[in-house]
A protein has these predicted regions:
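Transmembrane helix-loop junctions in multi-pass membrane proteins
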Residues: 47-52, 91-95, 177-190, 213-225, ...
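Selective recognition of specific alpha-helical transmembrane segments in multi-pass small-molecule
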Residues: 116-124, 204-219, 230-250, 283-286, ...
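Alpha-helical membrane segments and immediately flanking helix-loop junctions
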Residues: 69-101, 127-130, 137-153, 169-172, ...
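Membrane-interface loop-to-helix entry segments
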Residues: 36, 44-60, 166, 187-193, ...
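N-terminal alpha-helical transmembrane segments of multi-pass membrane transport
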Residues: 1-89, 99-106, 117, 443-477
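Flexible loop linkers connecting adjacent transmembrane helices
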Residues: 50-75, 97, 103-106, 119-161, ...
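Helix-loop-helix module between adjacent transmembrane segments
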Residues: 40-45, 116-141, 150-215, 369-380, ...
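Extracellular/periplasmic helix-exit of transmembrane alpha-helices
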Residues: 124-136, 242-258, 272, 302-305, ...
Length: 477
């Protein structure tokens, strides 16, 4: 009964809700989440006046802010946490799947969704900063969609409330989602290590859970570990990709030509394949960078910064790093490998075959280790997100915090030794419901973030004019 219900909800959220016919007899199937996320991204890209493009330098500057409270997080540290959860298995296997089904053109649409997704990420992160509150358990600050949803309905009613039903549903959806993801993470890691090194899954699982337990059961060890692991894993993957690109530099014109030709190609439209190109790129871009799902705001709220806009700009940059940089790295690895090398393969096997072609056996080992680091950091990141949602539901007590961590560790163990698709579907349902609750409230509250952006821009303009005036006075003297 419950399994059947979950399957129906999963199909409603992730299945093709509508079909748009295309020339050549094909059609584009669009899911409910795509219907929600794409218009939301476009809407806020217009409202912010192309923020991801015109304010990219400000995104970089936002990382340099210093914190006064040693227990709080800097904007850079919150970027590390959100990048840890964004950059995961989807950046490897997900991109491979998108290209396998949608072709090289899917990469272009992945880039487009990153641009509009950055605008959504800015708005939700700025709102999280505006509605954050002190964290008496971990010190610093906490917040996220559950908190700004709560404040919205509390302000509307004019009465103090302990809980708001929509905020409660969001928090529960998040906790369900992150437990499901824990299973996917461990299953991917153990399978990868078994294929690459022949290590039995039970051994990898025990080590994975033991290391995770040592970190997550300590009060503030998660961020300290991520501060080290995330930059190393991202830089190593980027450097290896640059090496592969340089090694195959002669192929780059044809690779980019394929990306753009297949993104708009008449041949794809005529063959009815344009829908696959478009939707696979869009899906991979949206669900890799998490913009709109409400996950990253849980990290953004923890930042200590002099204006909420800086937290928003930081998370917009996170979308760029995830999709434009890391996902593109995987795409370049795939598109520079000969078709006969990867033919007939899928998923992780396909990516490992491409890496074996480029770097020999080292490539296979490197991908296995990279998947471990990407996935492990994702697990640590989602438990950081869970803190604020557990606190919203159960109050400020260590019992509930510890119980959820133990539950996540159990799911990590179970996922390492067996694959339960029901639990995976439950996790996907969780993130789908999170997205529905979050995008709905963004339309109602997004004006607050836009107002903060206008104030920020006016302040920067006034500061710039003041500096120019001072320089003019100095020249006159």
């Amino acid at each position: 009964m419950i399994v059947a219900l979950i399957e129906k909800v999963y199909s409603f959220l992730w299945g093709d809700l509508i079909h748009i016919p295309l020339p050549g007899g094909g059609s584009v199937g669009i899911s409910l989440l795509i219907i929600l996320l794409i218009p939301t991204g476009i809407y806020f890209t217009v409202r912010t006046r192309l923020l991801p493009i015109r304010m990219f330098p400000d995104m970089i500057k936002a990382l340099t802010g210093k914190k006064e409270n040693k227990d709080s997080l800097s904007t850079f540290q919150t970027l590390i946490v959100s990048t840890a959860t964004r950059v995961g298995m989807g950046n490897l296997v997900g991109v491979v799947a998108a290209i396998s089904v949608g072709g090289a053109g899917a990469v272009f649409w992945m880039w487009i969704t990153a641009i509009i997704g950055s605008s959504t990420a800015f708005v939700e992160a700025t709102l999280a900063q505006l509605h954050k509150e002190p964290d008496p358990l971990y010190s610093g600050y906490r917040g996220g969609p559950a908190y700004y949803i709560h404040h919205y309905f509390e302000d509307k009613s004019g009465k103090k409330k302990k809980h708001v039903i929509i905020a409660v549903l969001f928090a529960i959806s998040g906790l369900i989602c992150w437990c499901g993801i824990s299973q996917v993470i461990s299953n991917s890691v153990t399978s990868s290590f078994e294929n690459a090194f022949g290590v039995p899954t039970i051994y990898t699982t025990i080590i994975l859970v033991a290391v995770a337990a040592v970190i997550v059961l300590r009060k503030n060890a998660t961020v300290k570990v991520l501060d080290i692991v995330v930059p190393i894993m991202a830089v190593c993957y980027f450097v290896i990709t640059i090496f592969i690109i340089i090694k195959n530099i002669g192929m780059m014109p044809s690779v980019f030509s394929r990306i753009f030709e297949e993104a708009f190609g008449i041949r794809q439209v005529a063959a009815g394949g344009f829908g696959a190109v478009l939707m696979n790129g869009v899906k991979r871009g949206l669900f890799s960078n998490e913009a709109g799902s409400g996950s990253a705001p849980c990290a953004a709220a923890a930042a200590e910064c002099d204006t909420p806009v800086k937290a928003g700009l930081t998370q917009a940059l996170g979308v760029f790093i995830d999709t434009i940089v890391i996902c593109s790295c995987t795409a370049m690895i795939m598109l520079t490998a000969p078709e006969n090398i990867v033919a007939g393969k899928e998923g992780m096997d396909l990516l490992q075959s491409a890496m074996r072609y480029h770097l020999g056996d080292f490539g296979v080992i490197f991908i296995a280790v990279t998947l471990f680091l990407f996935s492990f950091s994702t697990f640590l990141g989602i438990l950081f997100y869970a803190r604020s949602n557990v606190a919203y539901l159960f109050g400020d007590n260590w019992i509930s915090q510890t119980m959820y961590k133990v539950l996540a560790l159990v799911m990590l163990f179970v996922g390492g030794i067996a694959a339960y698709t029901f639990v995976w579907d439950l996790g996907d349902v969780g993130i789908g419901l999170m997205t529905i609750f979050n995008t709905g409230i963004l339309y109602l509250m997004g004006g607050q973030a836009i107002k903060e952006l206008r104030v920020f821009e006016e302040s920067n303009k006034a500061q710039s004019n003041s500096q120019c005036s001072q320089q003019g006075d100095n020249v006159t003297q």
